[in-house]
Amino acid sequence: MKFGYFCNTTNWDHKPYDQLLNETKEITTFCDENNWDSIWYTEHHFNHEGMESCTNPLMMGVDAAARTKKIRIGQACNVITFHNPIRLAEDIALLDQLSGGRVDVGIGRGIYGREAINMNKEADLKDQAKNFRLFDETLTILKSLEKKFFE
């Protein structure tokens, strides 16, 4: 059995963001030093209520790679409908190199309408079929980038 920590950076108390990030860094270091198998960061935007305050799980992963030695680093998840697939693949590959191959990739379509409409109008969750087509197209591109050539 393997154990991972889902680092959901909630901020119900409305702490200063730097304090929230420092606490997240401490949790990351603790998990690595205490032999957890993985740590997972979220991607959420525009959450003024204080929940899920991490906007970029890949950037959190870069910090984790620099401060840890063995823990695997995951994203729960990269909302791929918000991103250019080629740029996202490059960022994931760079994190994997910087971490010494410790990256686990998690992907999703998004859950909050205000995120989708502001990050990519094409990902509007009011049209689930359109959102899913965008997800499928982006996933196809991401998978094809594992190869040397793609169409």
Describe the function of each predicted region:
Residues 33-35, 76, 150:
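Alpha-helical hydrophobic/aromatic positions enriched in membrane-embedded helices and signal peptides
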Residues 74-82:
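Conserved strand-turn element in the central/C-terminal portion of the radical SAM core barrel
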Residues 1-67, 71:
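N-terminal beta1-alpha1-beta2 module of alpha/beta enzyme domains
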Residues 2-19, 81-151:
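Flexible, glycine-rich active-site loops centered on histidine and acidic residues
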Residues 42, 76, 106-108:
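Structural motif
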Residues 24-27, 61, 76, 91-93, ...:
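Short, flexible coil/linker segments at or flanking structured domains
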Residues 39, 73, 103-105:
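Hydrophobic residues within beta-strands of alpha/beta enzymes
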